[in-house]
Amino acid sequence: IGQPGLPPQGFAQPPLQPFPGNEPYVVVDVNAEETQTGRLMIGAGVNSNAGLVGNIVIDEQNFDITRLPTSWDDIRNGTAFRGAGQRFRLEAAPGTELQRYTATFQEPYLFDTRIGLSTSASYFTRYFFDWAEGRVGGRVGLGYQFVFAPDLSVNTGFRGESVDIFNPRVQGIPDIQGNGTNNPGMLGKNSVYGFSGGIIHDTRDSPFLPTQGHLATFEFEQVIGTFIYPRGVFEARQYFLLNQRPDGSGRHVLSLGTILGFSGPDTPAYDNFYAGGY
């Protein structure tokens, strides 16, 4: 799928070349060349919010979980674990105040249907000013794209996490250490089980580097476990194509976006919304 006059996304050159003729059927010569689908990114940074942080990312957008390597040549020429249109992302971000490790797998067409599957597992540690936080858990989700409205989809998901709050800077704070049965506090290990559902309207020309269209999402989640509370997030983004070369390259894009979230009064501090930083 691409813009008029441009190669379809995922191909270096237009793959279809029809031969002229007067027959009711057109003979098509298919000559497709796949572009680069995998990325390896390595970086590091330092800032006043998170200290020194490294970043290593392996991202493959044409993954195949069933295509195991049969020889060293499959690994050397890049054919192992590729070819099914799945996405796999492995990220490691070690640091002095923040460290995060995640693995994500996405199947956009589960069993050749319009149902998509996404799974992820993560480990996270962050040293805040007033306490330290550690998380380990995973998520699984299903999505469905409507036939009558391809831009519209719905999703449902579940997340399970164990959140450990430790090393409080000040003792006796009720929100951290609690002050009775009605407020157990969040110090120690907390169980988080979230059940969510959402709706998405997406007209972007590309999910990775969009230049036109919009994305509007709304997700509601009910969390149970150590604390019980609802959460909701609305996000909207609009992309405007300002200028481009005659061949479609060198695009200048203006992007506008906003996020609105709400959460119940019993939400613990580790799941609150905060302005600025992370």
Language model: regions and residue ranges:
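Conserved short loop/turn motifs at secondary-structure junctions
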Residues: I1, L90-A92, Y123, F220-V223
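Aromatic side chains
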Residues: F63, F105, S122, F129-W131, ...
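Transmembrane beta-barrel wall of Gram-negative outer-membrane proteins
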Residues: P94-S191
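Short loop/turn motifs that connect adjacent beta-strands in outer-membrane beta-barrel proteins
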Residues: D64-G85, Y109-G116, V147-S153, D205-G213, ...
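Residues that cap or initiate secondary-structure elements
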Residues: Q36, S48-A50, D64, T96-L98, ...
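C-terminal outer-membrane beta-barrel translocator/porin domains of Gram-negative envelope proteins
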Residues: F19-V27, G38-G51, V57-D59, D164, ...
